[in-house]
């Protein structure tokens, strides 16, 4: 599982954890997150996220 970081605000999407409050189940790969999903902290789209090694 990978982690993706918002380059604008630093929010981390962790594939292992998902975002259950937003309907994204734990274990959901980044490419399976809906294309219209936006960062819950700053509102930018998936194009503004980069994979990170933590």
UniProtKB/Swiss-Prot annotation:
<feature type="binding site">
    <location>
        <position position="9"/>
    </location>
    <ligand>
        <name>Fe cation</name>
    </ligand>
</feature>
<dbReference type="InterPro" id="IPR024934">
    <property type="entry name" value="Rubredoxin-like_dom"/>
</dbReference>
<keyword id="KW-0408">Iron</keyword>
<feature type="binding site">
    <location>
        <position position="39"/>
    </location>
    <ligand>
        <name>Fe cation</name>
    </ligand>
</feature>
<keyword id="KW-0963">Cytoplasm</keyword>
<feature type="domain" description="Rubredoxin-like">
    <location>
        <begin position="1"/>
        <end position="52"/>
    </location>
</feature>
<dbReference type="InterPro" id="IPR024935">
    <property type="entry name" value="Rubredoxin_dom"/>
</dbReference>
<keyword id="KW-0479">Metal-binding</keyword>
<keyword id="KW-0249">Electron transport</keyword>
<dbReference type="GO" id="GO:0005506">
    <property type="term" value="F:iron ion binding"/>
</dbReference>
<protein>
    <recommendedName>
        <fullName>Rubredoxin-1</fullName>
    </recommendedName>
</protein>
<feature type="binding site">
    <location>
        <position position="6"/>
    </location>
    <ligand>
        <name>Fe cation</name>
    </ligand>
</feature>
<dbReference type="GO" id="GO:0005737">
    <property type="term" value="C:cytoplasm"/>
</dbReference>
<comment type="similarity">
    <text>Belongs to the rubredoxin family.</text>
</comment>
<dbReference type="InterPro" id="IPR018527">
    <property type="entry name" value="Rubredoxin_Fe_BS"/>
</dbReference>
<comment type="pathway">
    <text>Hydrocarbon metabolism; alkane degradation.</text>
</comment>
<comment type="function">
    <text>Involved in the hydrocarbon hydroxylating system, which transfers electrons from NADH to rubredoxin reductase and then through rubredoxin to alkane 1 monooxygenase.</text>
</comment>
<dbReference type="GO" id="GO:0009055">
    <property type="term" value="F:electron transfer activity"/>
</dbReference>
<dbReference type="GO" id="GO:0043448">
    <property type="term" value="P:alkane catabolic process"/>
</dbReference>
<dbReference type="InterPro" id="IPR024922">
    <property type="entry name" value="Rubredoxin"/>
</dbReference>
<keyword id="KW-0813">Transport</keyword>
<dbReference type="InterPro" id="IPR050526">
    <property type="entry name" value="Rubredoxin_ET"/>
</dbReference>
<dbReference type="Pfam" id="PF00301">
    <property type="entry name" value="Rubredoxin"/>
</dbReference>
<feature type="binding site">
    <location>
        <position position="42"/>
    </location>
    <ligand>
        <name>Fe cation</name>
    </ligand>
</feature>
């Amino acid at each position: 599982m990978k982690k993706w970081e918002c380059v604008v605000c630093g929010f981390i999407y962790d594939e292992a954890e998902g975002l259950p409050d937003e309907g994204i189940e734990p274990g959901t790969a980044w490419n399976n997150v809906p294309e219209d999903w936006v960062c819950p902290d700053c509102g930018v789209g998936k194009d503004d996220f980069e994979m990170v090694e933590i």
